[in-house]
Amino acid sequence: MLRVAVPNKGALSEPATEILAEAGYRRRTDSKDLTVIDPVNNVEFFFLRPKDIAIYVGSGELDFGITGRDLVCDSGAQVRERLALGFGSSSFRYAAPAGRNWTTADLAGMRIATAYPNLVRKDLATKGIEATVIRLDGAVEISVQLGVADAIADVVGSGRTLSQHDLVAFGEPLCDSEAVLIERAGTDGQDQTEARDQLVARVQGVVFGQQYLMLDYDCPRSALKKATAITPGLESPTIAPLADPDWVAIRALVPRRDVNGIMDELAAIGAKAILASDIRFCRF
């Protein structure tokens, strides 16, 4: 039986649960449940703190886990990333009081508060910067105001929380994070390979369905070359003749984030009846 870790709370919990449910796996009926057995798919799910998931997977106690890339980097666990899941995006940045043009070199000799001490120490060592890293488990933004730290290193989304505490992010991100599906490093050739690959394929199919749309449209045959350049699809677009020999029907997958621009381009070359449809799953 495969053993899979899922975040038990926080911003990653609900999207992770939804993806697994869409992939055909049993969901928990009570938020207090710490384990759920799915006998149909021969999988047991464990609902754990996101920060602990990489450690459990890296130790070999669990086969897979869903957590943030930033948490994986900080854990130092021997895991590998199988899939990026397309939600929970953020950057891990340094931040310090606003009103000054900070650089990472300014961190030398400072006290840096963070909930990710290993990640910060590794980055500082890479840059040859000596500083004191102070571990806090949350609300690190207030540490500067309270005089506990001179700067912080934390996950930055919109930046609103930093602004509320008169802080500004600076330097290159230590880590660009999002939710990821991880497994223990060095699992090639082990038992349950088929079951493992099936879980990855199912989850990947759901994620792909969230990131792509199916585009159907009618196109003048004279504009076919331009149209297929705009919508090349994954392997190749589907092209079918219409009753009017001067027109063809084209179908292709397109990235959801680009669909409006693509439709504009198609309309500009004379395409008609351009229809974008949601897809739930995709195997490829």
UniProtKB/Swiss-Prot annotation:
It comes from the Bacteria. It catalyses: 1-(5-phospho-beta-D-ribosyl)-ATP + diphosphate = 5-phospho-alpha-D-ribose 1-diphosphate + ATP. Pfam families: HisG, HisG_C. Its EC number is 2.4.2.17. NCBIfam families: hisG, HisG_C-term. Catalyzes the condensation of ATP and 5-phosphoribose 1-diphosphate to form N'-(5'-phosphoribosyl)-ATP (PR-ATP). Has a crucial role in the pathway because the rate of histidine biosynthesis seems to be controlled primarily by regulation of HisG enzymatic activity. This is ATP phosphoribosyltransferase.
